[in-house]
Amino acid sequence: NLKKERNNLDNTAVVLGDESLLIPVLNSLPENIDALNITMGFPLKSIPLASLFEQLFQIHKKTSSSFYYKDVVNIVSHPFIRPLFYESGIDKASEMIDIIHENNLIYISRDRLKGFSKTNDNILALLFDDWNTVDSILENCSQLILTIKNGLDKNKTSNLLSLEYLFRFNVLFNELSHLNSKYSHIKTISTLHDVYKELLHSETLDFQGEPLQGLQIMGMLE
């Protein structure tokens, strides 16, 4: 029992046969565990934040001027996005989803989306404004990361892992910006998406800890 064995974990290791189990294990560790060493990397593509940017690329690659309602619901419900719509204890994301369902909306224009929540129009703009150029896409993604970070910083100690995710994705988009400035072949959103995926699949999130102290978490090959 990890809760009871706080002072006797120096010789304890958790061995994971599947790297995808790492994040669920970290999220379920008792709060009393204050020393931890993780010796396995975690693929950046498997981090929850990756699914958000994949959804954004997919909706903006379509040429339609409106969005399918399920795509809108999935994005505003994303665990990294939904907290941005909390206002004075009110879940504005839920209110938007209710409007969509109550009015049986199938396709939703950008203007109508912005009308759902005037106080959150800056966030809606980051998510749903037209991605006209590669430069504007990269700027939007960087601003979105910063906006999410500002929200998480309000309770930093409880969001250390999520903030680490954001840092790594910020590095990734900075690298994309560097490649876009250095080379001239990234002309379309589809090309940018391909380069993004190539970088994403080559990166891992590496953790640091004290190798001689606390609970050890490792993969089968460690």
Language-model features: locations:
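Polyanion-engaging groove/track-forming segments
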Residues: 1-222
